[in-house]
Amino acid sequence: MLLNMNLQELKQKYNYDVATKMMQQYLDIKFAHLDCLLLFRMGDFYEMFYEDAILASNVLGIALTKRGKNGEEEIAMCGVPYHALENYLTKLIEANYKVAICDQLETPEEAKNRGGYKAVVTRDVTRIITPGTIIEENLIASAEPNYLASLVIPKNKETASLCYVDLSTSEIVVVNVPETEILNELARLKPREILLSENLRSSNLADSIFKQLNLRITYQVDSFFAINKCEKIILDFYKMKDIKGIGEISSSQICAIGSVLEYLSLTQKQNIPHLPIPRIIKFHSYMTIDFSTRRNLEIVTNSQGGSQGSLLSTLNHTVTKQGGRLLYNFLSSPLTNIAKINHRLNITEFFYSNLEIVKKIRELLKKTSDIERCLTRITMNRSSGRDLLSIKYTLETATIIKGVFFDAYGFNLPDFIEKIIKPLSGDAELYNLIDETIREDAPNNLNDGGIIKHEYHPKVAQLHDLINNGKLYIEKLKDQYRKETGIDSLKISHNNVIGLFIDITAKNVNKILDPKFIHRQTTVNHVRYTTAELQKLESELVNAKTLVISLEKELYADICSQVIEKASYLRILASSLSGLDVFCNFAYIADEYDYVKPEFTDDLSFDIVKGRHPVVEKALQRESKSFVYNDCHLSELERIWLITGPNMAGKSTFLRQNAIIAIIAQIGSFVPAKSAKIGVVDKIFSRIGAADDLIKGQSTFMAEMLETSAILAQSTKNSLIILDEVGRGTSTYDGVSIAWSVLEYIHDKLKCRCLFATHYHELTVMSNFLPALQNYTIAIEESGKDILFLHNIISGAADRSYGLHVASLAGLPASVINRAEQILLKFEKTSTGKGKNILSTESNNLSLFYLEPNKTTISSKLDKKFRTIDPDKLSPKEALELIYELKKLV
């Protein structure tokens, strides 16, 4: 509502003309930031007023108070302490609010000196915090990126451009994305905030981004993405004369990059960190995994959006934050280039063959810091001395890590390992700069002082000497004046009116002969003096704290500027350390969980021997149970496995584990199997399970058909398709027909690898005329009416689904199971196609939902009733009533 008002309407609403000067200042700033919650610094608190206060008090759970009236309207107010700001910001950002931080740009004393005692302290917004522009350690997940993305769709709409930046690490990337893959790419990146043109607000794309992916969209006017404007922004930011300095980029990529930089400038108030030139990547350089498949396979999050039970949580034994983020990126973007995959696998194999080195390196890596994010805070003037110390300790540890390699291999390291550890040699100049300037006990807050080593700068040493030894200097001056005057009782005292003064008794006045003693005050029994020396000392003592903090800030800024000059090296070092962490992690889990190096081919092989599902296996291990491994042998000649068998037997686990093995292999890790030979997979599609999507108005069947349609449209010969129960959301005949035709299409048109699980046993006859389709089933062991699921995949087809057995395991009443067996028997005795007639006959005689009384049921009820009777406590009347009740029951 406020966004639709003009300035005059806003002033009228808030009684601007009769507001105090301070409140007018607040309103001026608020009117310029209507889309934000405004946190207004007042002394030691950030205050919020009017509607902002009401919203914030609810979100933060803090008291809502009032700050007088503005005209007739009471002003709602709430506030948070400045030192606890980050704790409250977390809640506001999680609630999807943009927050404008308005700080005091001068002290109250400076304001008085400028404009008298009525002057209002100058304030302004120093930054705007949005989900995609956070850098505070406490506000962002340390083990995953925090992307801000800008999506630009040109008029031809065939290819969109996407630029994404992680402000906390200074990573910036641009990519062209086919229009059909936009949602999949956004699902891969999971940006915290997406910039989108206002023209797309009512589009299907915007609706899908918000509803299907649950991502936050920040709309901007169309001119925000104008090509000429964006090109100028890029040239100015990178100090270039020609846009070709970025590389070969399209017009829409220019708009995407420029709009991201402009948004950062607006939210960070020009205080943008040093960003490298955007990295231009090719869309098809990594495996395509659509958003539905990512959800089904629980790659980086579980089905509820948490981390526990995800593939990432199972594989993540990294020991650094930056290593965790790199592993997250690896899993989100598996490679599709065989050479690059094998390069990673060779690195993993090296560390797997050197587990003693891995153990030492992992212990050392724990001592390193997240220097990517330290560097960002430094470049944005939001760092502390501890950020510099973190860089120093990391430089020191890096050289020790390199020494571990040298001790083991000398100069005989493989080239691919030498390339990784080359940056670990450190930078002696940078290390010495920090070591010589920053105190080991440097505080978090620059305003606390004590960050610069005293010996680094003589003035710092002098000022700290005054702060620490002020009383000693006063004592020395007192002793000097006693000697000069001969007055042994002379004192130097202090009060708030005249400050430091020399105090003598009235009887000693005649001994004060030197004119340097200046009379200040006379009382009944005492006379007070001062001197130029004492006034100078007092001034130095009073100002020492302020002066040293100011000087330390100046020196600290200079040190930071020298660190920023080393930004490129520090980013390379961070990349090296995170890479070491991830590959040592791969070696660790390969050893810990018995993983094997996969082999890659350029054909359609998918030959997995004794494969296992890593997440399920780990869960079973916690219960001291073993996972039942299975083989999977897909090839040019046997591309499709049609898998039949009962529920709960392990079909879905088998389907998922093979998709997961492909993903793990193509990130460069060993895999949970005895052996694995894989033709590179360019896309993985998984349609496993469904639930009615009531929010989007889609039934289970519609959701299933939409996903299946997308799979058939986007798959290529090199894709891997995982389908479970296609067609189950409709009638049996419709379902069988759809599943049948889908299988034919995959076999004849796509010719890709596919695992297809179904309850439609009618489909198994397709192996007679589709040469690349083979039937497989789940092994079971029967004993009378009981069956045991063996969880083994074997060649052949299931003759029934064992659904009644599963229903019994689920706890359905015995009477329901018995009745179901009766009806099933009649179906099985009737030829295919007459089931409908049986159902009709049954419904005429007896409802399918009517439970015919039987002796077992009656006996059970009587037994239950008799157990509640105590004959000794029944009165004659109660006994008679009980007899009638039992007769009625029978």
UniProtKB/Swiss-Prot annotation:
SUPFAM superfamilies: DNA repair protein MutS, domain I, DNA repair protein MutS, domain II, DNA repair protein MutS, domain III, P-loop containing nucleoside triphosphate hydrolases
MF terms in GO: ATP binding; ATP-dependent DNA damage sensor activity; damaged DNA binding; mismatched DNA binding
Keywords: ATP-binding, DNA damage, DNA repair, DNA-binding, Nucleotide-binding
Entry-linked SMART domains: MUTSac (SM00534), MUTSd (SM00533)
Name of the protein this chain belongs to: DNA mismatch repair protein MutS
Disulfide bonds, paired cysteine numbers: none
One GO BP annotation of this record: mismatch repair
General function of this protein: This protein is involved in the repair of mismatches in DNA. It is possible that it carries out the mismatch recognition step. This protein has a weak ATPase activity.
Entries under HAMAP family matching the protein: MutS
PROSITE patterns membership: DNA_MISMATCH_REPAIR_2
Origin superkingdom: Bacteria
Pfam families attached to this UniProt entry: MutS_I, MutS_II, MutS_III, MutS_IV, MutS_V
Gene3D superfamilies: 1.10.1420.10, 6.10.140.430, DNA repair protein MutS, domain I, MutS, connector domain, P-loop containing nucleotide triphosphate hydrolases
Entry keyword annotation includes ATP-binding: yes
Sequence similarity: Belongs to the DNA mismatch repair MutS family.
Residues holding ATP: 645-652
Keyword Chaperone: no
